[in-house]
Amino acid sequence: MCRLLLFTFSTVVFSFSPAVFSQQPSPSAVNSPPASEANALVVNSLLGLPAVPIPINNPQTPAKVNLGDKLFHDKRFSIDGTISCASCHDDNQAFTDNLPVSVGHGGLTGTRNAPTVINAAFYKSQFWDGREPDLEGQSKGPFINPVEAGLPSHEPILEIVRTDPAYQAAFKDVFNVAGKQLTMDHVAKAIASFERTIVAGNSPFDRFYFGGDKNAITEQQQRGFELFLGQGRCVSCHTLEQDHALFTDSRFHNIGIGMNAVQDDVPRLAEAFLAAKNQGGDVDKMVLTDKKASELGRFAVTDGLSEIGAFKTPTLRNVSLTAPYMHDGSLKTLKEVVIHYNNGGVTPATAPVNPYLSGGIRPLNLLDKQIDDLVAFLEALTSDYYPKTQVADSQTGGRHE
């Protein structure tokens, strides 16, 4: 009999079974365990994570998650039928595309690196600049961005889901809607429900820190953890709690990335951006089609001068699988990332002083050996799996396996 891990969110119960391992990391990235070990991994697959937050107005059901999965992978929702959500958030590449910036329809490129969907359910806001508060809002944007899916509006998507027999039946089953009653909000809720099942804990670090297995990480990784907490000051933003670790404060910081090319022009850029925004400019489109506008960061959302060049702290979970790094994909390796911080947020080391740099960013004075230790620790944050969770139907109480 399968061993199941059950945890509740209000009336919703999630469960795990070996079937959840249908979406696994690339074999070159993560080794699959013997079948005899699978159940143990299933039982502990959320070690180190808190309960997944589920919106009251969008409860999880197996049918909704399955519908969201189909929508996430449907390439028809793009101007030329070549781009789906999974094009930039590939199941087999840790739900990223491993490119500096993503490639949309017709080979067009944007300005920002595609963050992993793994554990995105825990963020307090979505996108690098936090311009959407939740996964529902986030899921709508890429379809109508000119350098992503490229649709002129959401109407082509609604035409498909309202007329495709399989989608008609699924939306009727999940939301009890049909025809014009079926809106983009329903599409977004299904996609978001699917994305909330893409969670992964149980890394070697979790087994060491939360599971009490002192042999789960190497001595070098333990030294790196000490640096993470101490001299490296990483934990200031990539936070740890007593019973879980999201490795993000969900806040926004200017860490120096991307500022070299624009900092002398920031006053003019900020003024021009605000003028365009006040005249009805779409922030989503402006920041993904204009490299310089992109570097304004959180300012583009809040208009706050203190947030110029500030971007959201990403989780460090599974970071060894999601290269290249930073909001613009400009750093190729974890070692480059650590060196950037070691230099006080300056890359290259000869770059001019950044007046917008967040106050906590300063030289760390790490030795080469310490840099290697810290990188080794970051590699210990890789989960053995990042499965889709199995969801119990909150209306029937039955588990979907």
Predicted regions and their residues:
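Short His/Asp/Glu-rich catalytic/ion-coordination signatures at enzyme active sites or charged loops
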Residues: 149-152, 197-208, 213-217, 356
